Regions:
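Active-site-proximal polar cores
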Residues: 1-43
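Short, conserved turn/kink motifs that form compact alpha/beta structural patches or helix kinks used as
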Residues: 25-156
Length: 156
């Protein structure tokens, strides 16, 4: 019950193994985004970024509903069964292929260009931190991302 209240979002994560995109559905996550401009001492500043909080206990599944397990990016790149796993590939560290996600559930894996064309809330993974200390209820990934879609709305 508490998880539903504090982690109310679903995202569709796309991760790449070589040039093949794989769809990962993450339900029970928290997405906080800032899309637009803010006024600061230096003037208007564009702030198109988001933070995705993923509990370590999240159920990650493919479109068929099969459970997937997390692998760090280098281990994922070497794995022989990428369809059974997922990862977070930050921009600039994955030989041109970085993970991105779409707010909500999408039906199938797609390229970043296709996601930008078809969905409003598209985010590119810029980096992530693993918080694997404290009680299991507090353990999570904190994923920094930048808005990559054409749609910009303050406070979405």
């Amino acid at each position: 019950m508490i998880k539903d209240k504090w982690m109310p979002h679903t995202v569709s994560l796309i991760c790449f193994h070589q040039d093949t995109p794989f769809l990962v559905l993450l339900r029970g996550v928290m997405l906080q985004s800032m899309n637009g401009r803010s006024v600061q001492r230096r003037g208007d500043v564009e702030e198109n970024e988001a933070t995705l909080y993923i509990p370590l206990s999240v159920r990650a599944e493919n479109a068929a509903g099969e459970d997937l397990s997390f692998l760090p990016p280098l281990e994922y790149a070497r794995c022989t069964e990428p369809e059974k796993h997922w990862t977070l590939q930050p921009e600039g560290e994955s030989a041109g292929r970085c993970s991105f996600f779409v707010k909500g559930e999408i039906p199938e894996a797609c390229s970043l260009a296709e996601a930008r064309e078809n969905y409003d809330f598209v985010y590119v993974v810029a980096g992530w931190k693993l918080h694997d200390y404290g009680s299991p209820a507090l353990q999570h990934w904190e994923v920094a991302s930048r808005v990559s879609s054409h749609y910009y709305q303050y406070g979405s």
